[in-house]
């Protein structure tokens, strides 16, 4: 089931079955929570903090995830999920600070921050995905993250880089359920989600290279409309979606944390080159986008994976990154 959560007048309260067809009188920013990792294993808590100058204290809520054995996980929340941050009726339009953390054993491992102005009317969408590319890259002063890379004050990780945490409220997209929950229908259709392992079986592995312009990329002369790219991690890492011979973290086409095709090359986040990461790519499926979340038992969109991941062997063949 999808879970939509409302911060009505900045008080966190649960809602069930929130519909995109209902337009509130007051403006909202619809916060979208998503991930390319596996809740319950890669992180066990999602924490949301909202601070508004009109309030004397910070408002917050935590959701827990846990392993229950046999490779299965349970949680307080299905992902992707939405949190409606509603403008106060007497609000001044001041900047609202939003912070989302993915924690593991109490340690913040992925932290996203944004500063936005809640609109006077209508519903805008703010996507804050908890992506593996931002693992252990947190804002300076984050409590409990002593071993992480620190972004300077006013900066937070986005696409593996420290970037300004202020969002242009006027540039935020209008809320559209289909851009979060696949086809926007009830969670009974497998094509609303992305079969991570199934789409990479028989694919290729490649190590991207960093060019003089600072772009991290690899050569690709195929059809980008049939391309998918993922970070390929050792099975021992147990991050993302794991088969017998590799774990994959899928990258979304067109996102800062994902990939784009450019002049016969595929450009990916720079951090993947500086960290010496290996990639997997395949032309078996249409490209995964942010609107098509992974298929998983914790998903609010699609069905559980069709095949038992323990029985899947990707069999990736080495490819050249090109000149």
Predicted regions mapped to residue ranges:
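Signals and flexible motifs at protein termini associated with secretion
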Residues: 1-323
């Amino acid at each position: 089931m999808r879970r939509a959560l409302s911060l009505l007048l900045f008080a966190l309260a649960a809602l069930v079955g929130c519909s995109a067809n209902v337009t509130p009188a007051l403006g909202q920013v619809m916060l979208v929570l998503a991930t390319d990792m596996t809740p319950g294993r890669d992180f066990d808590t999602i924490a949301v903090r909202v601070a508004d100058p009109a309030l004397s204290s910070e408002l917050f809520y935590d959701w827990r995830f846990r392993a229950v054995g046999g490779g299965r996980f349970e949680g307080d929340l299905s992902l992707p999920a939405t949190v409606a941050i509603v403008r106060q009726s007497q609000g001044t339009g001041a900047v609202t600070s939003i912070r989302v953390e993915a924690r593991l054993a109490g340690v913040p491992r992925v932290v996203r921050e944004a500063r936005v102005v809640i609109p006077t009317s209508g519903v805008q969408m703010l996507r804050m995905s908890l992506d593996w590319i931002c693992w252990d890259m947190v804002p300076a002063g984050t409590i409990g993250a002593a071993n992480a890379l620190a972004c300077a004050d006013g900066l937070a990780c986005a696409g593996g880089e420290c970037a300004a945490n202020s969002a242009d409220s006027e540039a935020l997209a209008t809320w559209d359920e289909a851009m979060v929950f696949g086809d926007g229908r009830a969670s009974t259709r497998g094509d609303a989600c992305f079969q991570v392992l199934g789409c990479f079986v028989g694919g290729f592995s490649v190590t991207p290279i960093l060019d003089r312009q600072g772009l991290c990329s690899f050569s690709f002369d195929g059809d980008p409309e049939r391309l998918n790219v993922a970070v390929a991690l050792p099975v021992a890492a147990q991050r993302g979606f794991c088969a017998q011979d590799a774990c994959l973290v899928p990258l979304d086409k067109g996102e800062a944390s994902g990939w784009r095709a450019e002049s016969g090359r595929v450009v990916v986040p720079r951090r993947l080159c500086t960290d010496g990461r290996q990639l997997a790519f395949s032309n078996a499926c249409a490209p995964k986008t942010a609107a098509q979340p992974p298929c998983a038992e914790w998903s609010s969109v699609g069905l559980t994976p069709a095949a038992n991941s323990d029985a899947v062997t990707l069999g990736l063949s080495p490819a050249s990154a090109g000149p």
